[in-house]
């Protein structure tokens, strides 16, 4: 296992699942974009929002692929919605969904870019959000 792959696995285990915010300060570079800014604090803001909505949210790694300065992580997640998730009020429902996260590392082994693709439609359906077709006409 490469150092970058190990760092990606640690990022998911420590920051996402265990909520060990100090690990984000070790793993994430100052210039890494996040929610409303850059650096570990901005990356943590995104995870804090998820944990506030789904306090028991846990991610399970399905695939991890490392090449050069990048690591791709395919995952499944599940949790109970106990807080607001965007405009969706707490439902108390358990939702499971999947996604992929792509990480880019600098030469020192710190994360400099994070990109997520999440099955948001899948998640919102499980929370009872009604999906309507787009409006047509004027």
Regions found by a protein language model. Name each.
Residues 1-138:
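C-terminal and inter-domain tail/linker signature
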């Amino acid at each position: 296992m490469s150092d970058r792959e190990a760092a990606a696995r640690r990022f998911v285990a420590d920051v996402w699942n265990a909520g060990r915010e100090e690990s984000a300060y070790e793993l994430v570079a100052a210039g890494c974009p996040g929610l409303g800014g850059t650096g570990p604090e901005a990356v943590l803001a995104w995870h804090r929002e998820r944990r506030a909505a789904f306090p028991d949210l846990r991610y399970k790694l399905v695939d991890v692929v490392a090449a050069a300065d990048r690591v791709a992580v395919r995952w499944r997640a599940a949790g109970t919605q106990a807080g607001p998730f965007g405009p969706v009020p707490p439902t108390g429902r358990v939702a499971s969904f999947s996604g992929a996260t792509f990480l880019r590392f600098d030469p020192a082994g710190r994360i400099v870019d994070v990109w997520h693709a999440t099955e948001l439609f899948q998640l919102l359906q499980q929370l009872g959000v009604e999906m309507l077709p787009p409006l047509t006409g004027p």
